[in-house]
Amino acid sequence: MIKDISFKKFKKLIDIDFSFDKDVNIISGTNGTCKTTLLHLISNGFQMPKVRSPNYNNNNCLKVIKTINRIANPKMEAIVRESKSYTDPAEGTKGNLFSINYLDGSALDFRKHNSTNPDEAQRYAIKPLYPRGGPKQSLPAKPVLYLGLSRLFPIGETKDDDLTKISLNLPDQYVDYISQLYKDFLGISISNIESNNIGDFKSGPLFDTDNPEIDSNTISSGEDNLFIIVKALVSLRYYFESLLVSNDIKESILLIDEFDATLHPSLQLRLLAKIREYARSYKIQVFFTTHSLSL
């Protein structure tokens, strides 16, 4: 996982270093200060582990996690839409743009790579700057779940034709964890928990409750957002508990853009406490952006 990032130049991040906690990191700042960009670069610093491994007690775990959580291990070029004309994120700077130091003592430098695909002429990728002739290096293999602002699109405003039921689901034990956490936060008992793909941009909840007037189609945006965050936490718990051996300081990363969006301040604090608990118990390193004054 990430210990610190040192920037030479990338957009507005010039000659600046960021050090991170191994558990939970809150990124705050005014609008347009590259908070979300920082999340993108963190995700870009990892690769998805192999789907099958002799270290899994359940070889289905990563497939399930990737399917029910919309964005896993995204790369910069896949989640960022740049300006209409090409904009160099590090004009006048070549080679190393920034360096990531990982908790295991390893480090990687990163460079810009312009796409050679004419259909992606305005996009660039951020790739490791591997030294020539040195020892072979590669991105650390850890699952990263990225919860962007697309998760806030209200399911109640979605046409039925845009909803597709996801056939895979977490094991019953972990579905029960989601149900219990949701009840602890909101006092709502949910059952028959599954997931829906909403278009091609969001994985939303599908469930019933003990109140006939409330189900996954009628919940508020905040209740929807809470479910998605809780599902991501439990998914990474499932991954950790699927490992036969865990020798690393951290085993996964959770990234949340605008953590406080749609959530009442009191719920933000309670959810933050639960995130800290999960980060420590299940070896998750968490990063989220916020405009909250209370967090």
Labelled PLM ranges:
Residues 2-33, 40-47, 217-295:
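Switch/communication elements of ASCE P-loop NTPase nucleotide-binding domains
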Residues 77, 82, 91, 119-120, ...:
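Glutamate identity and glutamate-enriched acidic tracts
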Residues 72-81, 210-216, 256-267:
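Short, charged low-complexity intrinsically disordered segments located at boundaries
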Residues 145-249:
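Extended helical coiled-coil dimerization/tether regions that scaffold
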Residues 4, 131-133, 205, 215, ...:
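Residue-level detector of functional hotspots within protein domains
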Residues 1-157, 165-174:
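P-loop NTPase switch/coupling surface
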